[in-house]
Curated annotation (Swiss-Prot):
It comes from Helicobacter pylori (strain G27). Belongs to the universal ribosomal protein uS11 family. The gene is rpsK. GO terms for biological process: translation. GO terms for molecular function: rRNA binding; structural constituent of ribosome. This is Small ribosomal subunit protein uS11. The keyword Ribosomal protein applies.
Length: 131
């Protein structure tokens, strides 16, 4: 009988980080939340689709709120107490995600920045939808 190769899983190392940056990427289809330290190293992340929301439900404000709460609960385990917020994209979960970061107990918001890239008349946009 052949021996099984068992691979050991990586253990999550608990970091002690006081300040972090919350990146909210709100697209028309999904909302991604990434929490990093001040140097840009990723601590944890969460998405609306990863929480079980499928199809058009991923782009709802409620799904964005749940994604923020999930990511911040993971970040609190690493000791994050103060965060800055960087928001990108035109999605519907954008405002709700910002509000739910501010409403989370034990996390203080230091600043909010909009980092949505705006073209100076770059690429031609796609044609209009006809329904």
């Amino acid at each position: 009988m052949a021996k099984r190769n068992v691979t050991a899983k990586k253990k999550v190392v608990k970091k002690n980080i006081a300040r972090g940056v919350v990146y909210i990427s709100a697209t028309f289809n999904n909302t991604n939340i990434t929490i990093t330290d001040e140097m840009g190293n990723v601590i944890c992340w969460s998405t609306a689709g990863g929480l079980g929301f499928k199809g058009s439900k991923k782009s709802t404000p409620y799904a964005a709120q749940q994604a923020v709460e999930s990511a911040l609960s993971k970040a609190k385990e690493h000791g994050v107490k103060e965060v800055g917020i960087k928001v990108q994209g035109p999605g519907s979960g954008r405002e709700t995600a910002i509000k739910s970061v501010g409403a989370t107990e034990g996390v203080k918001v230091l600043w909010i920045k909009d980092i949505t890239p705006l073209p100076h008349n770059g690429c031609r946009p796609p044609k209009r939808r006809r329904v």
